[in-house]
Amino acid sequence: MPLKDLPLDAQPREKLLARGPAALSDAELLAILLRTGLAGKGVLQLAQELLDDPVRDPATGRSAGGGFGGIAGLLHASSQDLQRIKGLGPAKRAELMAVLELARRAMAQQLREREVFDSPQAVQHYLQLHLAGRTHEVFAVLFLDSGNRLIAMEELFRGTLTQTSVYPREVVLRALHHHAAAVVLAHNHPSGSVQPSRADEALTQTLKAALALVDVRVLDHVIVAPGAALSMAEQGLV
């Protein structure tokens, strides 16, 4: 249904102005950005389709259509990912990518400006925003100062859906570059499970030993999946 056919107080823009953004659903907020749908598909339907769960190929686990699994997944959509959505032309893709990038930068700035990390949950939430929507495996490191304040986050290695090659020497060099006193390791499981594998446990201990040689502590290793995160430190595995 076209927005103009909705009652005025149910149209997303007017609803936002009258009641504030918290009163709107994710799809309604997204519809304001998109502004228009396409023939046979209203903008609210288009917005909801972007937020729907992805359809995965059972053989490979890769996305084979559908949406991005919510706002967190949409945050990591590339221009190529958005291009497959019928109804998103170059102008809409550019506007959407700009807004999503601003959201990522705001989260990064907020975390950098914390006096210290409030809790493991705050770090997990930040990592979910950055990693949960990826369709390939990424290994990232949060570099911290002596007060556990964030210096930088870097994605150091990218792999397939099932494995990634992580080189301890490179992690150590980046820690020295940032003059880090501690690190939080992180990687995602695109398959959806946050349970650590034996390889995850072995990698954690290898990196912990390598970083200890340069007096850098490993505080945690966080595993991220769509809608979930697990702290290996809280499981006694660090």
From Swiss-Prot:
Sequence motif JAMM motif, residues: 187-200
Keyword Magnesium: no
Residues that coordinate or bind Zn(2+): H187, H189, D200
Signal sequence range: none
A GO MF label: metallopeptidase activity
Kinase in keyword set: no
Listed GO biological process terms: proteolysis
Family: Belongs to the UPF0758 family.
Protein name: UPF0758 protein Dtpsy_2777
